[in-house]
């Protein structure tokens, strides 16, 4: 077994036509991006960004943005849960 054979095993057949396959798109990513544009998610993201800016501007603080992060993720994932399974086969 030579070096060329090993390359073919690692990368496929070595045929450039096979390597130009259509790139698959994860439906979860697409639905998340759509849901992040909805009003409830936009407001939650704004609260998260305000908190992040507030915490980042201070050198000494006990505050973190865990609650705001979870609120944003909950709002986004709630939207995703209702839309994602319609896109799956």
UniProtKB/Swiss-Prot annotation:
Membrane topology label: Peripheral membrane protein
Pfam family, any one: UCR_hinge
Location of region: Disordered: 1-27
GO cellular component terms attached to this protein's record: mitochondrial inner membrane; mitochondrion; respiratory chain complex III
Protein keywords: Acetylation, Disulfide bond, Electron transport, Membrane, Mitochondrion, Mitochondrion inner membrane, Respiratory chain, Transit peptide, Transport
GO terms assigned for molecular function: ubiquinol-cytochrome-c reductase activity
Family recorded in the similarity comment: Belongs to the UQCRH/QCR6 family.
Function: Component of the ubiquinol-cytochrome c oxidoreductase, a multisubunit transmembrane complex that is part of the mitochondrial electron transport chain which drives oxidative phosphorylation.
Name of the protein: Cytochrome b-c1 complex subunit 6, mitochondrial
Organism expressing this protein natively: Mus musculus (Mouse)
Biological classification of the source: Eukaryota, Metazoa, Chordata, Craniata, Vertebrata
